[in-house]
Amino acid sequence: MPEFLELHSKTSKLLRAAADAAVQRHGLRLGQDHLLAVLWAEDGRTPGEIAAAVNVTTPAVTKLATRLADSGLLERRPDPHDNRLVRLWLTPAGRALQEPIEAERQALEDRITATLTQAERAHLIKALTKIQQVLVSDLA
């Protein structure tokens, strides 16, 4: 396997495990925090809008939303203008998770980039952004 792909694959697996452990401390599973983050930014979005924002399928969002609704973190409400649509809204418990989850994510980022200089960190973010743009373009 090419050097970059191998290193990226191993790093991604480790990062995913660390991120999963961080959100599990708050009763969430990896992915649920991403859905909640979309709603923290703009509450009342449709599953399709959330799917586009986090680059997953609408059925995947629906499944995550069901688990979050069952946990009391969000609720489904019909769209007031289109009866075919459902919108997802945070409950007070869902809103209350924003600060601790964002703090966990920031602490994780700080921990894993602690050995990088500011210049190295900026370069890494710039390089990863360029790679992401190529992949998004290729998959479009």
Regions found by a protein language model. Give the residues of each.
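N-terminal leader segment of winged-helix/HTH proteins
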Residues: 1-26, 71
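Short alpha-helical elements of helix-turn-helix
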Residues: 2-6, 26-37, 122
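Charged, amphipathic alpha-helical coiled-coil/dimerization segments
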Residues: 16, 66-129
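Short, locally clustered residues in the helix-turn-helix/winged-helix DNA-binding domain
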Residues: 37-41, 129
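Residues within the alpha-helical elements of helix-turn-helix
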Residues: 38, 53, 71
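Short capping segments at the starts of secondary-structure elements
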Residues: 42-46
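Residues within helix-turn-helix
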Residues: 47-48, 59, 66, 86
